[in-house]
Amino acid sequence: MNLKFGWNRRSFLAAVGAISGGLFAPSGLNATGTFGKKSKSSMPPVDGSPIVPITTGLGSTGDIYAELGITPLVNINGTLTVIGGSVMKPEVMELIRRGNQHCVSIDELEIAAGKFIAKLCKSPAGYTGLVTGGAAAAMVVGYAGMMTEDLAPRMRDIPDVSGFPRNEVIIQKSHRYPFDHQIRQTGAKLIEVETREEMIAAINPKTVAIHFTNILSDKGKVSGPETVAIAKAHNIYTFNDAAADVPPKERLWEYPAIGFDMVTFSGGKDIRGPQASGVLIGKEELIHYSLLNMSPQEDRIGRCCKVGKETIFGLLKALELFVNEDFDAELSKYDARAQIITDAVKKFGVTPLPRVFDPQALGNVTPRYSWHIDPAKLNITGPEVIQKLADTRPIGIGSMGAGASGMRGRNPDAAAVDDHGGHHGPPRNPNSFGFALWQLKEGEDKLIADRLVEIFNAVLKA
């Protein structure tokens, strides 16, 4: 399909609809919600054809983004919270729909979900899971549970932990990061250390746990297994924040197997569950304490970390799909997307660079694709290309600030690029541009390719 970039919102949505067809219908359903031409199933699709036609008010035009005056994005940055995380698969959307059909005891559902997670993720004996409102929420309720146990007065008092017998958390100085705010949110006091000897010396009767920031493990002097060994020797807990650290999927069971008492993973990143979801895997007793500190319980620090029944079902399906996914096959799909772009831009002297992919990286383990611009043929820099993609309308291609200072929410008007190549990127070569492709929907690689052709043609005509 040849998609022309006389960009307007109606033509774009029509094009995407033509590309995707029944993409958003549940697995096995076509865009009309039936299996093939005939089916006894009356189950409607989640998206594609609407469950309920909307003829008035919000949604009646078919373009909810335009109705609110906002710009949707083609995601070439990755699973960043600032742009909404990942794109859920149709099967996940279908479980969300089914999860909304009945009311249920949330505590009962969480306990059942925990058993499902533990089995799926090959958790050690005595471990279970918990669906949380994100990995940050998992840290809040996890640390709260460590300190309160099942004592109601403590659960009501937290974050005033001044009278708690144990309220200190040891953390390596190199492991300090924005998300340790969630530990401090519980009232716990962080004790910084640098070496193994300092870690051992810092342990005292007030120490409840040692925090381990997985993505920063190469920055510290005490490894994960060493941290676990020290904690076990002194009868204190360990918590591993591995929010963005799958794939590889094996980490879902490898980290608990090391002996961490609690490990959290984001549900809304590469697992591709609901954006406001997380997975907490830990010892059954600690997970029980964590659930006591979160919604649906009242007068608890985690009441604001509410997780709905729909989110729980969606996360479980996303996790199941992720664990059973053939990552090599997925990687081949990403390569094919990159080739579509390469084929479109090669006539401008723009050539592909080697794919950057380290499957054993500590976090954000996803391939990045880049292309080199011959400055003798095109008078445009790589950062300028990325900015022009972000400036595309009616739908932006890129984060428009997620990779720059807007990532931390300090400056939402920041440029789409910075001197370091965006989120977790190396210093940018002015004659190259690159991005991630794993969050693209079907057909969006062609949209990007056509937009790049338009950009480079405009440069030649200038």
Where are these regions (language model features)?
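Conserved C-terminal alpha-helix-loop-beta "cap" of PLP-dependent enzymes
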Residues: 346-459
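Short strand->helix junction
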Residues: 103, 217, 245, 441-442
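Metallocofactor- and cofactor-centric catalytic cores in central/energy metabolism, strongly enriched
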Residues: 79-87, 93-94, 98-116
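Conserved PLP-enzyme active-site core in the AAT-like
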Residues: 13-16, 39-74, 78-83, 87, ...
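Short glycine-centered, acidic/aromatic-flanked micro-motifs in structured strand/loop junctions
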Residues: 98-100, 214, 373, 437
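Structural motif of enzymes handling amino- and sulfur-group chemistry
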Residues: 93-95, 303-369
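N-terminal export signals
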Residues: 1-36
